[in-house]
Amino acid sequence: MSKQVIEQEVLGQVLGPLADNERLKRESKNLRGTIEQDLEDRITGGFTADNFQLIRFHGMYQQDDRDIRNERTKQKLEPLHNVMLRARMPGGIITPKQWLAIDKFADESTSYGSIRLTTRQTFQFHGVLKPNIKLMHQTLNSIGIDSIATAGDVNRNVLCTTNPVESELHQEAYEWAKKISEHLLPKTRAYAEIWLDGEKLATTDEEPILGSNYLPRKFKTTVVIPPQNDVDVHANDLNFIAIAKDGKLVGFNVLVGGGLAMTHGDTSTYARKADDFGFVPLEKTLDVAAAVVTTQRDWGNRSNRKNAKTKYTLDRVGIDVFKAEVEKRAGVEFAESRPYEFTGRGDRIGWAEGIDGKHHLALFIENGRLLDFPGKALKTGVAEIAKIHKGDFRMTANQNLIVAGVLKSQKAQIEKLARQYGLMDDAVSEQRKNSMACVAFPTCPLAMAEAERFLPEFVTDVEDILKKHGLPEEDNIILRITGCPNGCGRAMLAELGLVGKAPGRYNMHLGGNKAGTRIPKMYKENITSAQILEEIDSLVGRWATERTDNEGFGDFTIRAGIIEEVIISKRDLHA
C-alpha cells in the first residue's frame, strides 16, 4: 500500500508514492485501528506506531516528560508516556459547570495538575496516563464536551472572534462556528465505540466530506468579526470574515490558504497568507466550507506531507483554478468582497460592557497556563469564580480567558475574586499582554527550544529595553515564541517572532504588523537569547528615534530597510 501511486485530476498533478500516513488511515477501519487493544496493554504506557498517529484524530497526542527522559533511559525505563488532549470547543465557550468538572479532572487525573488554554481557542490536558484516558473522555462526555477531530488530518477546532461588546453579532458568528464544526466533523462511530463504550454520537461510518482517507493534512477554520483579528486569519486554511449590515450578519468574505508551519532548511515550505475569494451570503456558508475542504481533499499532496496543506495546493494549481472548482462544487459564484478592516488582534484585558448591558471581564493568562503559582493561585481563582458565575467563560485565541455575561450585581464580587487570586494585576505591562508562546518543553515531542518556560523572563528583558529607550506603555511589540517551526505560537505573524532551532537558539523574524496581515522574514538565524536581546536593543533604539508618528515596530523595520517585506511568500520568504 505504501508504494501505491496517487493520481490527482488537476493541473500540476502530484504523482508519487503515498505517504505512510495514507496507508494507516486507509487501513484504520475509520480511525479505529487497534487502539482498544493498546489500551488493554499495560506493559507499556504508550501506543504502537500506527495508533500513535490515529489517536490524534480522537484529539490526543502521545507525549512524554522530556525533562526526565535521559534519566529514565539510564535506568533502562521507557519514556514516561502520557497523552495530551485538546478539547473540541467551537468558539471557545464553556459553562461554569463544565469548567469545574475539567478543573477537578486536572487536579485528580493529570500529572501536571494544570489546564492549558491554547491558540486554538480551547483547553488542553497534559500528562494523562494510559489508565486515565478512557475516564478522561467519559468525564468530558458527561458534561457535553468531546475531543473529536481536534488533531489529525481533519478540520480542527473552529475559532470564532471573542467579541463581548457586539453581543448579538458575536452570538450569530458563534452559531455559525458551531454549524461549520458539526458539518465538517468526521461521521465515524470510532470515538464513541472506543471511549464511550459504544454510546452513539454519530450514525454512519460513511465520510461524504472527508472521504475514506480523510484529508491530506490538518485543516483549520475560523469565523472572525472585524476589526478584531484575534484568531489570526492568515494562520488558517479557511476563514469566514463576518459582514454585518445594521448590526446583523448578512454573509461572509471567504479567505483561503493561510498557514504558518515550515520545516527548517526546506525552502519548499513557507508561511503564507490566505487569499481573498470573495463574498457569499449566509445560506451558502456550509456549501462553501464543504467545497473548499473537498477540493483540498481531492487535490492536496498525499505524497509529501511537508507540502500537503491547502496553501501549497493553491500555489501549485493556481488561485483562480482552485476558486473556480470551489464555486462549481458549492453551486455559488463569489461576489466581490465587502469592505472590512483589521485594526488589531489583542484581547481587551479588563472590563467591557456589551450592548446587551451585561459585563465581560477579560483576564490575562500568561501563556494560557492555569496553575497555582506562588502568590498567584490562578487555577483556584477561576474555579472560585466558576462557583458563583451565572454567565459563561470564553477562551480566546490569545490564550486568555473572558468571564462573560456578568450581571451587574455580581461584578464587584467577581472582580474581588480575580484580584484575590492574582487573575487581575494592574502591574502587567502591555508588552507582556501582547506576548505569547506555545507549550514546547517539557511535553511537546517536536520542541527544539524552550518557549512557554522561556517567555516570562525574556519579556521582562524586553520591557527593560523599551523603558531604557523611553518608550511609553502603549508602544509595545507583538512578540511570539514557538519552540519549533510548526508554528503553534504563531510567531510567523508577529512583529518579532522567535522560532526554536536548537536548545537555547532561535531564528529571529521581523516585519509582521499589529493587525496580523503580514508575514515576517528571517533577520538572524540560530542565535542565542543574549544575542537576540542585543539585536532588540539596537533595533528598539532606532525605532524610538527614527519612527514616524504612531509607526509600529514591524512597520518601522520594513520602512527603515532593516528587513524586506514579504508580499508573496513562495517568492519572498526565503529570498
From Swiss-Prot:
Catalytic activity entry: hydrogen sulfide + 3 NADP(+) + 3 H2O = sulfite + 3 NADPH + 4 H(+)
GO biological process: cysteine biosynthetic process; hydrogen sulfide biosynthetic process; sulfate assimilation
Enzyme Commission numbers on file: 1.8.1.2
Keywords: 4Fe-4S, Amino-acid biosynthesis, Cysteine biosynthesis, Heme, Iron, Iron-sulfur, Metal-binding, NADP, Oxidoreductase
GO CC terms in record: sulfite reductase complex (NADPH)
Cofactor note as given: Binds 1 siroheme per subunit. Binds 1 [4Fe-4S] cluster per subunit.
A Pfam family hit: NIR_SIR
Cofactor: siroheme; [4Fe-4S] cluster
InterPro entries hit by this protein: CysI (IPR011786), NiRdtase/SiRdtase_haem-b_fer (IPR005117), Nit/Sulf_reduc_fer-like_dom_sf (IPR036136), NO2/SO3_Rdtase_4Fe4S_dom (IPR006067), NO2/SO3_Rdtase_4Fe4S_prot (IPR045169), NO2/SO3_Rdtase_4Fe4S_sf (IPR045854), NO2/SO3_Rdtase_FeS/sirohaem_BS (IPR006066)
Source domain of life: Bacteria
GO molecular function ontology, one term from the record: sulfite reductase (NADPH) activity
Binding site for [4Fe-4S] cluster: 438, 444, 484, 488
UniProt-annotated binding residues for siroheme: 488
Pathway the protein acts in: Sulfur metabolism; hydrogen sulfide biosynthesis; hydrogen sulfide from sulfite (NADPH route): step 1/1
Signal peptide location: none
Subunit structure as annotated in this protein's UniProt entry: Alpha(8)-beta(8). The alpha component is a flavoprotein, the beta component is a hemoprotein.
Family listed: Belongs to the nitrite and sulfite reductase 4Fe-4S domain family.
Function: Component of the sulfite reductase complex that catalyzes the 6-electron reduction of sulfite to sulfide. This is one of several activities required for the biosynthesis of L-cysteine from sulfate.
NCBIfam families in the cross-refs: CysI, PRK13504.1
Name listed for the protein in its UniProt record: Sulfite reductase [NADPH] hemoprotein beta-component
Gene symbol of the encoding locus: cysI
